[in-house]
C-alpha cells in the first residue's frame, strides 16, 4: 500500500504537466497566445507574419529576420484535437497536412527544464518504490527471492535509463546538403524545419541560428534532409522526405545578409 501511495503522489504532477490543450476547430485566425506554438512549427504560414509594403515581420518572434513577401509565406489553417495538432497549407492543391503532438509543447520557454526535472523525479520515485517493496519482502521472503528482486531492480534501472535518457542516433546528412556555417542564417530563416538548422540532444532540439528560439522536442517537423542550391539570383532548397518539395526565394532576402551582398559585388567586379 505504501508503494502505491508514493506512486500516486508522483503521478499527480506528471498528469498536471501533460494536461491536454482544449480542442480548436479548423481556423486560419489564431488566438494571439497560441502564435508562439504554431509559428514554431508552421513559421511559413501567413498568420505568423505582419506584412506591410512588401516587408514581413514575424509576429511571434520579434527579433526574427524580416523578409520580403514572396511565395515562401503560405496560407494555412490549423486544427487541434485532444491529443494532436495539425496545420494545413491551403495555398496549394491538394492541401498539405503536417501533424505535431500538442501535449508536449504547452509552454516552450520552460519545456526543457521541466521535462528533465520530472524525468529525474520519476526515476528517483521509482527507485524509492522499489526500495520500499524490497524492504517489505526482506521481512517476509527468503534470500533467494530477495536476489531475484534485486536482479529485476537492476534490469528496471537499465531500462529506465535507456527510455528516459537515451542518446539520439547521429543523423547522416546527404553529401552537399549542409550549407556553410556563414549561410545558416539565410537558409534557416526560410527553411527553418531543415535538420541542419537544429542541434538535437536527448530529444530536445535547439535552433543553431536563432539562439533565443524556444527549444522543441524532436519530431517529424525536423526530419527533413534538405538540399540547398545557390544560383546567381535565386536560391532554392528541397525537402527530401516522402517526396521532393522545392521552395525558391531570392537570395538577397533578408536584405541584411551582408555576406551575400559582398559576394555579389565581387562577382560584378
Swiss-Prot record:
Residues 27-117, 167-269 are extracellular. One of its GO terms (cellular component) is host cell membrane. A repeats lie at residues 1-146. B repeats lie at residues 147-269. Induction: Expressed in the immediate early phase of the viral replicative cycle. The keyword Methyltransferase does not apply. It is found in: Host membrane. Pfam families: v110. It is a multi-pass membrane protein. InterPro entries: ASFV_fam_110. Residues 1-26 form the signal peptide. Glycans are attached at residue 75. Keywords: Early protein, Glycoprotein, Host membrane, Membrane, Repeat, Signal, Transmembrane, Transmembrane helix. Plays a role in virus cell tropism, and may be required for efficient virus replication in macrophages. Belongs to the asfivirus MGF 110 family. This is Protein MGF 110-1L. The lineage of its organism: Viruses, Varidnaviria, Bamfordvirae, Nucleocytoviricota, Pokkesviricetes.
Amino acid at each position: 500500500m505504501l508503494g502505491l501511495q508514493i506512486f500516486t503522489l508522483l503521478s499527480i504532477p506528471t498528469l498536471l504537466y501533460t494536461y491536454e490543450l482544449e480542442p480548436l476547430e479548423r481556423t486560419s485566425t489564431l488566438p494571439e497566445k497560441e502564435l508562439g506554438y504554431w509559428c514554431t512549427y508552421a513559421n511559413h504560414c501567413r498568420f505568423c507574419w505582419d506584412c506591410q509594403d512588401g516587408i514581413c515581420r514575424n509576429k511571434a518572434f520579434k527579433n526574427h529576420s524580416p523578409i520580403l513577401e514572396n511565395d515562401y509565406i503560405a496560407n494555412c489553417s490549423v486544427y487541434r484535437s485532444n491529443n494532436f495538432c495539425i496545420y494545413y497549407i491551403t495555398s496549394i492543391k491538394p492541401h498539405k497536412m503536417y501533424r505535431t503532438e500538442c501535449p508536449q509543447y504547452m509552454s516552450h520557454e520552460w519545456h526543457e527544464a521541466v521535462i528533465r526535472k520530472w524525468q529525474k523525479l520519476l526515476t528517483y520515485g521509482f527507485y524509492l518504490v522499489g526500495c520500499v517493496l524490497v524492504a517489505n519482502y526482506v521481512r517476509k521472503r527468503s534470500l533467494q527471492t530477495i536476489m531475484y528482486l534485486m536482479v529485476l531492480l537492476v534490469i528496471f534501472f537499465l531500462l529506465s535509463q535507456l527510455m528516459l535518457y537515451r542518446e539520439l542516433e547521429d543523423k547522416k546528412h546527404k553529401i552537399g546538403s549542409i550549407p556553410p556555417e556563414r549561410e545558416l542564417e539565410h537558409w534557416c530563416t526560410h527553411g527553418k524545419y531543415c535538420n541542419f538548422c537544429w542541434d538535437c540532444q536527448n530529444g530536445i532540439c535547439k535552433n543553431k541560428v536563432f539562439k533565443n528560439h524556444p527549444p522543441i522536442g524532436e519530431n517529424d517537423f525536423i526530419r527533413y534532409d534538405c538540399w540547398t542550391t545557390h544560383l546567381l539570383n535565386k536560391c532554392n532548397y528541397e525537402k527530401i522526405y516522402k517526396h521532393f518539395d522545392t521552395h525558391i526565394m531570392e537570395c538577397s532576402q533578408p536584405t541584411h545578409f551582408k555576406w551575400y551582398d559582398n559576394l555579389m559585388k565581387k562577382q560584378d567586379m
